């Protein structure tokens, strides 16, 4: 199985300006992400940046990068342009690794690519992990996933699903986790390049805007999303200055990462 990793990177960030170029132990964050991705089985790792500064930073460190438009409304649109620029065949598998995940597990990248390859009927693949904290289950920033018997996604939500009716009283939030353990969605996606190109032309789903979850567009239009359930908790991403300091501390303690 051959696949390509695409790393979309956008310079503007409300909470952390110039995030892709933030220094982590002497390297820009987006370069850290690309280097982690290159430890997977990917045949190619390409950063899709929206600013020449990103492309130049990657070039200085031997990372392949392309310049994409700045006016894309979503990451999916940026991926579609990247697929066109790279001339990828419609059947080619790509894995979208977020540019703010410098601790991404290379094995998780391989698993997401394999999940799509093993499910030819699926348009996308992604990953999930068991939730072991009630606080996480109730946290709207932790996206939950519910799967069918074949491991395909039924729904993603910021709400605590599945709702444990017998574990709550009078509609109040449950005091313990439901069993079996609910699943936390991990924001990594596998696609076939042809689907990436067509995705931006799909009408946005009403629930997509309500939940602010773009993957719901695929489900709303009847496409299957195969889900790999990982038994390894995902590494922390970087959204805020505090997140950045935590990740810097990890690399400072383990420079060989």
Curated annotation (Swiss-Prot):
Question: Which pathway, metabolic or otherwise, does it act in?
Answer: Nucleotide-sugar biosynthesis; CMP-3-deoxy-D-manno-octulosonate biosynthesis; CMP-3-deoxy-D-manno-octulosonate from 3-deoxy-D-manno-octulosonate and CTP: step 1/1; Bacterial outer membrane biogenesis; lipopolysaccharide biosynthesis
The UniProt entry, under PANTHER family, shows: 3-DEOXY-MANNO-OCTULOSONATE CYTIDYLYLTRANSFERASE, 3-DEOXY-MANNO-OCTULOSONATE CYTIDYLYLTRANSFERASE, MITOCHONDRIAL
Q: Subcellular localization, per the record?
A: Cytoplasm
The GO terms this record gives for MF are: 3-deoxy-manno-octulosonate cytidylyltransferase activity
**Upper taxonomic classification of the species?**
Bacteria, Pseudomonadati, Pseudomonadota, Betaproteobacteria, Burkholderiales
- Species, as recorded: Variovorax paradoxus (strain S110)
Q: Which CDD domains did the record assign?
A: CMP-KDO-Synthetase
Q: Matching InterPro entries, A to Z? A: Cytidylyl_trans, KdsB, Nucleotide-diphossugar_trans
Per its UniProt entry, which superkingdom is the organism in?
A: Bacteria
- The protein in question is named 3-deoxy-manno-octulosonate cytidylyltransferase
Gene behind the chain:
kdsB
